[in-house]
Amino acid sequence: KRFLTSASEASIFNYGTSDVPTLQIRGDLGTQASLTGLTAYSLETTVADDNGEPSFNGNALGVFEKVRNFTYSASGAGTLDIDNIPREAFLNAIHLFPAADVITNVEVFVDNVKVWDASKERMTEVCTGSGRTVAAGDYHIDFLLNNALGSQLTLAGTSDFRLRITHSGTISLTAYAQYLTDFATA
């Protein structure tokens, strides 16, 4: 993550295993028929207690980014209100991938307060100004564009979180929500 600029921020995503009984990592190798083997490595560290002695408590899993996807659709031009995206403690970004280039504006509301309102053109300016490339038709709401850990949208304790998407024609889209979460809520 390019927004993790200090050692303490970078260590937030270290995967400790003291509280994990098993760990399974799955991947899709696709059409890599020529792949003859896969090698995995585990880096082990000794955790010290306050006196500098080895601690057998180890590191806990910590926090990590979770991505969940949802699909939505509406016929004709108009607005699509989405109010059923699950709320986690922190939202890093929402990425909208419609089947056709019909999104004209998106608003985000948290407890009836508008926290985002941008046309497709304005969103593209914001993203490209931060070094991102936006594919035609896609819409991104990224709260970490300023590279500051802690600028995520806080959703913990909120009772209302919704998107209002204005679209110029029939819309069918997949929304990807990126959360900062911990092992207990994964």
Where are the regions a protein language model picked out?
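Beta-strand-centric surfaces of beta-sandwich/beta-rich domains
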Residues: 1-186
